[in-house]
Amino acid sequence: MSGHSKWHNIQAKKGKADAKRGKIFTKIGKEIVVAVKQGGPSADSNPRLRDVIAKAKANNMPNDTIERSIKKASGELNAVDYETITYEGYGPAGIAVLVDVLTDNKNRSAGNVRYAFTKQGGNMGSTGCVSFMFQSKGQIVIEKKDGLDEDELMMMALDAGAEDFESEDEVYVVATSQEDFGTVREALEAEGLEFLEAEIKMVPDTYTAIDEDTATKFQKMLDVLEDDDDVQNVYHNAEFPEGWEE
């Protein structure tokens, strides 16, 4: 199929913080709290909660941790009110960057995000300065395994409403519209498939190739952002050098 997901290129460069399983669970737990407060604690009637639970399971979040987050949000346990904010700006060499934040203190978050940008030669911009370069898409990543037929999986995904299907080195990447993400994900789940990733994210229309010096600076920026408890997601359009390692 047309297009390139760049999943491995970006996934491999997500930063040291993403290797900290507890931090990932904390961030997803905050997403669960927001989803429940917006649509209620029942996944059957709350599509956003279903999506976040799928993301949690793809990250191997224990069921009891998921349930605790749901109870927390539904008032059975003390829950914090979070504000959702997206910051936009430019990394080194003009890399377009979006930063999603869930915070109980937007002044703290704004200061921390601005510091991460400026420390590595980037700058925070105004709303809309780079978001037009991205589209909201569903992305489902499935590990290649013996017995999993590529053609069958592709037809299964496309029949369920997927927009695109990519075969990469070790994974298959299914792309969907934001609207059809839940339908496609549930159809694949019904076939017994497990996901390495299943979430709606901002995907760049085009990627910008960067050299090793820029990659080193930008990775430091990503590490600072992803180590911030308020930062939920960081999206960018950088294409790291082939074989580049931090």
UniProtKB/Swiss-Prot annotation:
InterPro entries (UniProt xref): Integrase-like_N, TACO1_YebC-like_2nd/3rd_dom, TACO1_YebC_N, Transcrip_reg_TACO1-like, Transcrip_reg_TACO1-like_dom3, YebC-like
The keyword S-adenosyl-L-methionine is annotated on this UniProt entry: no
Pfam families given in the database record: TACO1_YebC_N, Transcrip_reg
Subcellular location: Cytoplasm
UniProt GO cellular component terms: cytosol
SUPFAM superfamilies xrefs: YebC-like
Lineage top rank: taxon: Bacteria
GO BP annotation list: regulation of DNA-templated transcription
Gene Ontology MF: a single term: DNA binding
Gene3D superfamilies xrefs: 1.10.10.200, 3.30.70.980
Keyword vocabulary terms for this entry: Cytoplasm, DNA-binding, Transcription, Transcription regulation
Cross-referenced NCBIfam families: PRK00110.1, PRK12378.1, YebC/PmpR family DNA-binding transcriptional regulator
Family per record: Belongs to the TACO1 family.
PANTHER family: TRANSCRIPTIONAL REGULATORY PROTEIN YEBC-RELATED (PTHR12532:SF6), TRANSLATIONAL ACTIVATOR OF CYTOCHROME C OXIDASE 1 (PTHR12532)
UniProt name for this protein: Probable transcriptional regulatory protein CLD_1467
Organism: Clostridium botulinum (strain Okra / Type B1)
